[in-house]
Amino acid sequence: MASSTIYNIFFRRNSSFYATIFVSAFFAKIGFDVFTDSVWKRANAGLTWDEVKPRFLNKDEDAEDDE
């Protein structure tokens, strides 16, 4: 019963089938990007520019104060 409903909604017409494929691919890409970004951030914690930038800026300000 549920399979016939899914078939009639998503796969019966060619246009519905292609729309289902494109929408699924779009959301799968978003999910994959979010997953890989979280893995990358966890693997490189403390090494990204956003986290290291304040240390470099503080060193530059300290060097200017010494002059």
UniProtKB/Swiss-Prot annotation:
Instruction: Please give the organism.
Output: Schizosaccharomyces pombe (strain 972 / ATCC 24843)
Spell out the family assignment given in the record's similarity comment: Belongs to the UQCR10/QCR9 family.
Q: Which UniProt keywords apply?
A: Electron transport, Membrane, Mitochondrion, Mitochondrion inner membrane, Respiratory chain, Transmembrane, Transmembrane helix, Transport
Query: Which GO BP annotation is one of this protein's?
Result: mitochondrial electron transport, ubiquinol to cytochrome c
Mitochondrial matrix-facing ranges: 1-17
Q: What is its main location?
A: mitochondrion
| Listed transmembrane segments | 18-43
Its quaternary structure?
A: Component of the ubiquinol-cytochrome c oxidoreductase (cytochrome b-c1 complex, complex III, CIII), a multisubunit enzyme composed of 3 respiratory subunits cytochrome b, cytochrome c1 and Rieske protein, 2 core protein subunits, and additional low-molecular weight protein subunits. The complex exists as an obligatory dimer and forms supercomplexes (SCs) in the inner mitochondrial membrane with cytochrome c oxidase (complex IV, CIV).
InterPro entries under this entry? Answer: QCR9, QCR9_sf
Report one GO cellular component.
Answer: mitochondrion
Q: Mitochondrial intermembrane topology: which positions? A: 44-67
Protein name per the record:
Cytochrome b-c1 complex subunit 9
Say what the protein does: Component of the ubiquinol-cytochrome c oxidoreductase, a multisubunit transmembrane complex that is part of the mitochondrial electron transport chain which drives oxidative phosphorylation.
Q: How does it sit in the membrane?
A: Single-pass membrane protein
Q: Name where it's found.
A: Mitochondrion; Mitochondrion inner membrane
Q: Which domain of life is it from?
A: Eukaryota
